[in-house]
């Protein structure tokens, strides 16, 4: 199943790249505007392949517990402000409304790998974008204080997930509605990577969803305290 998924997900952008490259070589793209459009499409499809290869490389490290974490003290407010600003630019271009609420004190810290937590957020948001099917789409991000932890909530109003699929969405290679996933791409390991990263941070991740209404992903990470174990620094 994995090999079949990878073959399909690589073949789709490769076919597009070849087609548009041939269009340029054969003179079908006979205006500067067409050439620009073709080159941009080739670039975007190459990016899709690069993301898939990076995901598979990370998966191989996960499979052997070799993720290279770089833990550091992170200010929650500053960090998530930066993440949301970056996400917002991409969502704006896709005409998806983004809202953000931070209910955590400005001095709260966590011990985390900033690159890997950013990967978690980007994977979840990217998944939401894939399955948007409404004219007025939105993604809401909320950061809440829940005692010894911060809780991150990422809500969308996309297609949602069938309740029969919910117990398996974080399993490796699992694809809810395989035909739909084949159309949108993806290796089926994105959420399993997210789960592994959060658990390696001592946290927990879960989701709620209603088919037709959307999905909310939740994850928690423990706050930094002076007395906590600092072995990960």
Each model region followed by its residue ranges:
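A conserved beta-strand-to-alpha-helix junction within the catalytic ATP-binding
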Residues: 70-88
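Short conserved segment of the HATPase_c
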Residues: 161-175
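Conserved glycine-rich
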Residues: 202-203
């Amino acid at each position: 199943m994995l090999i079949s998924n990878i073959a399909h997900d690589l073949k789709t952008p490769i076919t597009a790249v070849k087609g548009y490259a041939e269009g340029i070589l054969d003179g079908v793209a006979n205006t500067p505007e067409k050439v620009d459009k073709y080159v941009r499409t080739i670039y975007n499809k190459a990016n899709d392949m690069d993301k898939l290869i990076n995901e598979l490389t990370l998966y191989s490290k996960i499979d052997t517990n070799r993720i290279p974490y770089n833990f550091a003290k992170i200010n929650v407010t500053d960090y998530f402000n930066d993440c949301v600003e970056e996400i917002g630019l991409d969502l704006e271009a896709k005409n998806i409304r983004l809202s953000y609420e931070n209910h955590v004190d400005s001095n709260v810290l966590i011990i985390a790998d900033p690159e890997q937590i950013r990967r978690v957020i980007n994977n979840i948001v990217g998944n939401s974008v894939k399955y948007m099917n409404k004219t007025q789409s939105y993604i809401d991000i909320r950061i809440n204080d829940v005692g010894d932890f911060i809780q991150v909530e990422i809500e969308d109003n996309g297609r949602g997930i069938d309740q029969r699929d919910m117990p398996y969405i974080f399993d490796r290679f699992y694809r809810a509605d395989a035909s739909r996933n084949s159309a949108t791409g993806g290796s089926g390991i994105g959420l399993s990577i997210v789960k592994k990263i959060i658990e390696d941070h001592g946290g927990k991740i879960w989701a709620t969803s209603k088919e037709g209404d959307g999905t909310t992903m939740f994850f928690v990470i423990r706050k930094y305290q002076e007395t906590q174990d600092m072995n990960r620094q």
